[in-house]
Amino acid sequence: ATEELKEFFAKARAGSVRLIKVVIEDEQLVLGASQEPVGRWDRDYDRAVLPLLDAQQPCYLLYRLDSQNAQGFEWLFLAWSPDNSPVRLKMLYAATRATVKKEFGGGHIKDELFGTVKDDLSFAGYQKHLSSCAAPAPLTSAERELQQIRINEVKTEISVESKHQTLQGLAFPLQPEAQRALQQLKQKMVNYIQMKLDLERETIELVHTESTDVAQLPSRVPRDAARYHFFLYKHTHEGDLLESVVFIYSMPGYKCSIEERMLYSSCKSRLLDSVEQDFHLEIAKKIEIGDGAELTAEFLYDEVHPKQHAFKQAFAKPKGPGGKRGHKRLIRGPGENGDDS
């Protein structure tokens, strides 16, 4: 959060503000708008909240009630994620939600509401929320929190472009050039594919399919951007010549933005599902790296063919007693009893 927003939060908690709108700009939480109280909280609600809900842009709203607890005035936390907003924005706002609550002070927040259409966050919508919470066998606060998290994770609209979010990941559609490259890899017409996410168009784009050998592979990995790579790894193993498709996800750490890291990680599993199921390409190994220098010939071989560890015998023969000992004699010889006879 910016210093301006932190200072405004401190001022607002004193009670002089009715509503705070928080948005994300340049990966920072900033103050979007604010309003002062006019009348009672229930009469101010729709007039203050509804005009600030943009049909394309998610946001967070903090709405002050007139009730107080030990820490001061109580607030509602409203998370707005409209159906028509880009999927990447929905994910970014969902991932930052806990940070906003922490910056404001969770002890001041009495209740939370999530909405994708204005009716969800209207005063009538809040009344329905209160009624459901007061129904028989109410959920505990922990259960309500878990339920809200699950709703946030799956409540993303599926669009005609087939990009959609599920608990298993996010799917951006493959552009035609990328699809053709995968077909060529299956037919072994190319041996290397590099792909990237187009964050604006929300698609997976082909970067290039330049012929690549193991020695060249490290130089194909950008040092300042994430990429997906498919490599036809030709090698010998136990006397056999093999051609194994290896998937490499390269993410150069914190040189990439939070949004980029989040989207690449989330899209990865759905991309691999599509490659294996739709293009019938068997992925021999899936590798994640931070630097191209990791892709040595030895590293690739060990990843595709992990060394087998030998196991010790489960029941080892017990060891004998230590030291050198002769056989124990059970019968004494003459004169050993102390008799002279």
Swiss-Prot record:
The keyword Acetylation is assigned to this record: yes
One GO cellular component, as annotated: stereocilium
Every ADF-H domain range: 1-131, 169-305
Annotated stretches, region: Disordered: 314-341
Signal peptide feature range: none
Phosphotyrosine sites (modified residues): 301
N6-acetyllysine sites (modified residues): 6
Keyword Zinc: no
UniProt keyword terms in alphabetical order: Acetylation, Actin-binding, Cell projection, Cilium biogenesis/degradation, Cytoplasm, Cytoskeleton, Phosphoprotein, Repeat
Modification comment: Phosphorylated on both serine and threonine residues.
Basic residues bias (residue ranges): 322-331
Protein family according to the UniProt entry: Belongs to the actin-binding proteins ADF family. Twinfilin subfamily.
Role played: Actin-binding protein involved in motile and morphological processes. Inhibits actin polymerization, likely by sequestering G-actin. By capping the barbed ends of filaments, it also regulates motility. Seems to play an important role in clathrin-mediated endocytosis and distribution of endocytic organelles. May play a role in regulating the mature length of the middle and short rows of stereocilia.
Quaternary structure and partners: Interacts with G-actin; ADP-actin form and capping protein (CP). May also be able to interact with TWF1 and phosphoinositides, PI(4,5)P2. When bound to PI(4,5)P2, it is down-regulated. Interacts with MYO7A.
Name of protein: Twinfilin-2
Gene source species: Pongo abelii (Sumatran orangutan)
